[in-house]
Curated annotation (Swiss-Prot):
This is Ig heavy chain V region 5-84. GO terms for cellular component: extracellular region; immunoglobulin complex. Residues 1-19 form the signal peptide. It comes from Mus musculus (Mouse). GO terms for molecular function: antigen binding. Residues 69-85 are annotated as: Complementarity-determining-2. Disulfide bonds join 41-115.
Amino acid sequence: MNFGLSLIFLVLVLKGVLCEVKLVESGGGLVQPGGSLKLSCAASGFTFSSYTMSWVRQTPEKRLEWVAYISNGGGSTYYPDTVKGRFTISRDNAKNNLYLQMSSLKSEDTAMYYCAR
């Protein structure tokens, strides 16, 4: 009886490990005001094309701000007024990648940027 319960628990744990969601951001750096930067996010562990995705940022004051949203197929995007016209979110579902093109950067754009599912 105990062996059976242990086996079920082990299978569930292993299944969870195999399905670990990973989002790995890259492309950050130091840029002068007015400059541009493109961020990338490599996704794994889930069916990327089935999910809407977003970029969020944490300011030096530790405030969390939503930056951009894109629908699962990429046809719809939304931005707050603070970045509208300067930031562009896009995705490549074949490569499981999310992107954020940032231009006309301002000092208030200084933050840690994260992709989110």
